[in-house]
Curated annotation (Swiss-Prot):
Pfam name, any one: RRF
Biological processes annotated in GO: cytoplasmic translational termination
GO terms, molecular function: ribosomal large subunit binding
Domain of life from the UniProt record: Bacteria
InterPro entries, alphabetized: Ribosome_recyc_fac (IPR002661), Ribosome_recyc_fac_dom (IPR023584), RRF_sf (IPR036191)
Record-level GO cellular component terms: cytosol
UniProt KW Protein biosynthesis keyword: yes
Disulfide bridges in this chain: none
Annotated compartments: Cytoplasm
Organism, scientific name: Paraburkholderia xenovorans (strain LB400)
Protein name: Ribosome-recycling factor
Lineage, opening ranks: Bacteria, Pseudomonadati, Pseudomonadota, Betaproteobacteria, Burkholderiales
Family matches, as HAMAP family: RRF
UniProt cross-references to NCBIfam families, sorted A to Z: frr
Keyword line: Cytoplasm, Protein biosynthesis
Amino acid sequence: MSVADIRKGAEQKMQRSIDAFKNDLSKIRTGRAHTGLLDHIQCDYYGSPVPISQVANLTLIDARTIGVQPWEKKMVPVVEKAIRESDLGLNPATQGDVIRVPMPALTEERRRELTKVVKSEAETAKVAVRNLRRDANEQLKKLVKDKEISEDDERRAGDDVQKLTDRFVAEIDKLVVTKEAEIMTV
């Protein structure tokens, strides 16, 4: 394994951590409606759990309402039940074969709780990135120990890994600021 492989592997894993963090952020509800909010909700389709997006058409009716139109008429009550029982605190209403999912306004207290959740998720993502940095540095030390690279090369590669870590941590911080602004906007 070369220094370039270690660096590239660390970068790919750090990017995956960022992607997972973005996915977690998308599940945190803001005052505005977006179809991604329902992505992780599963409903029962012929005995197997599937995401709602695979059995229904998701659209934005307005800034605070998501429209869910199941492709099969008999799926309407199943999808509605799945949305109602999700951990998002949503109260869907059916009109014919369209389920309207209004986004309730967030209270100030709830907004503050959500910002704490965002910060907690961010800290988890930062820890994951730092752990990946540690793993990469350990691999570099092993290369020095096995006399495959010099200590100077290890130091240079370690600096590169640190720059990667700083870049990804800064990206996490930027995502947090954006999400907090989104949550606190009334």
